[in-house]
């Protein structure tokens, strides 16, 4: 179990053990259906505090091959779905929060280098017996691992768009970042699922053509993910009543 490669289920377990936890595991049934298809690229955009990071941690806990999450998920919605056992803890998961790397660097070049070095440090340790064409290049190294070990990856990127908020007027920095994401994710056989979260949809940043492989699920157009990202009226009502919220606030 690593920090970025197969981070395990500790983070999700902490969420489940909290005073308030809303079951959103039905999202996994959707991601299971689109794994290794043309719909495998998912970008969810919501304002802060809408459970985006929780969902990212949940997916990492479910797919990561470095842990056993069967008991953890057994009491939730996904356990009753036909797809529950299909991919449970059967994938290499790379999970990163872009804000973490951005806050440690003073320019976009350094941020990308730090991200690559951090993930590669774990990958090269786990797959030390692979012949690498260039073990300083993340995309090439993942391709080498896939070709020699037949181990595909699921990539989860939380706060993918923080760069656009930090470098609002720096078009060169934005383009470098988008070029990195495209070369890392687009048309790569080693990727079986890519799940990104952000505040605004990709198209709002004027980069939709560069990342046009993503299906976007926003506040305006949530599609089949509506009840899994955010809170429906029924769920809000149930939890407000359960925590003895005054009646005039519940209504």
Regions found by a protein language model. Give the residues of each.
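N-terminal pre-Walker A segment at the start of P-loop NTPase domains
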Residues: 7-29
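Flexible phosphate/Mg2+-sensing switch loops adjacent to catalytic phosphate-binding sites
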Residues: 62-89
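Conserved lysine of the Walker
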Residues: 52
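Mid-core helix/loop region of P-loop NTP-binding domains shared across ATPases and GTPases
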Residues: 114-157, 161, 183-187
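Short regulatory helix/loop adjacent to the ATP-binding pocket of P-loop NTPases
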Residues: 203-217
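Conserved small/polar residues in nucleotide/adenosyl-binding loops
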Residues: 238-247
């Amino acid at each position: 179990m690593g920090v970025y490669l197969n981070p395990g289920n500790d983070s999700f377990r902490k969420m489940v053990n909290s005073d308030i936890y809303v079951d959103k595991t039905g999202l996994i049934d959707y991601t299971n259906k689109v794994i290794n298809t043309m719909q495998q690229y998912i970008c969810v955009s919501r304002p802060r505090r809408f459970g985006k990071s929780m969902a990212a941690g949940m997916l990492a806990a479910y797919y990561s091959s470095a842990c056993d999450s069967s008991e953890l998920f057994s009491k939730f919605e996904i356990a009753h779905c036909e797809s529950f056992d299909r991919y449970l803890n059967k994938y290499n998961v790379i999970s990163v929060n872009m804000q973490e790397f951005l806050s440690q660097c003073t320019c976009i070049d350094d941020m990308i280098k730090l991200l690559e070095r951090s993930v590669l440090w774990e990958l090269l340790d786990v797959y030390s017996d692979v012949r690498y064409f260039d073990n300083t290049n993340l995309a090439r190294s993942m391709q080498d691992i896939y070709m020699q070990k037949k181990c595909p990856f699921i990539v989860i990127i939380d706060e993918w768009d923080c760069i656009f908020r930090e470098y609002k007027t720096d078009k060169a920095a934005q383009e470098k970042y988008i070029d990195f994401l495209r070369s890392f994710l687009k048309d790569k056989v080693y990727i079986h699922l890519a799940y990104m979260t952000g505040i605004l949809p990709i198209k709002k940043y004027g980069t939709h053509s560069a990342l046009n492989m993503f299906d976007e699920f926003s506040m305006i157009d949530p599609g089949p993910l509506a009840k899994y990202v955010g809170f429906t009226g029924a769920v809000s009502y149930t939890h407000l009543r359960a925590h003895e919220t005054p009646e005039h606030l519940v209504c």
